[in-house]
Amino acid sequence: MKFKTLGNRNAPAVLFFHAMGVTGESSEPVAQYLQNRYFCILPTSTVYCKGQKYVSKADEVRQVEAYLKSQGVEHLELVVASSIGADLAMAFLTSTELPIGHVFFDGGQFAQIGKGTRRMMTPFLYLAIKSLYWSKGG
């Protein structure tokens, strides 16, 4: 993983988990706004780090925990997670012993949809996408 930080290390900490297809720097505009009051931590998953290999979700969580410890973070005021990052954040939240003040999920995919339901929904999803195409997005 790669970690970027903004703000004062002694300020309350905010941890961001990024969405799929982007890096931790995608949260930088928000972190820049918060950096005067918070220590913002923006990890980038090993999937997006050149020369690193993704091992597992548990390994990603371990790396986040180790980094927080190395920075002296003893409490997280806020954890922010978007899309697939919410899945990693949930794994982090269920295993960490750090106290957490608040959590904000944006578009987390937590639904457990069975194979039968997925098979049944596929034709409808196909038609929905096709109808958007036919209507030219309107």
Describe the function of each predicted region.
Residues 80-89:
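Gly/Ala-rich beta-loop-alpha elbow adjacent to hydrolase catalytic centers
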Residues 94, 100-131:
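Flexible "cap/lid" loop of the alpha/beta hydrolase fold
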Residues 41-78:
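Active-site loop/oxyanion-hole signature of alpha/beta-hydrolase fold enzymes
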Residues 29, 91-95:
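Active-site signature of alpha/beta-hydrolase-fold catalytic machinery across serine-
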Residues 4-50:
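Conserved HGGG/HGGXW glycine-rich cap/lid loop of the alpha/beta-hydrolase fold
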Residues 36-40, 74, 99:
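A generic structural motif
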Residues 132-138:
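Helix-loop "lid/cap" segments that line or gate small-molecule binding pockets
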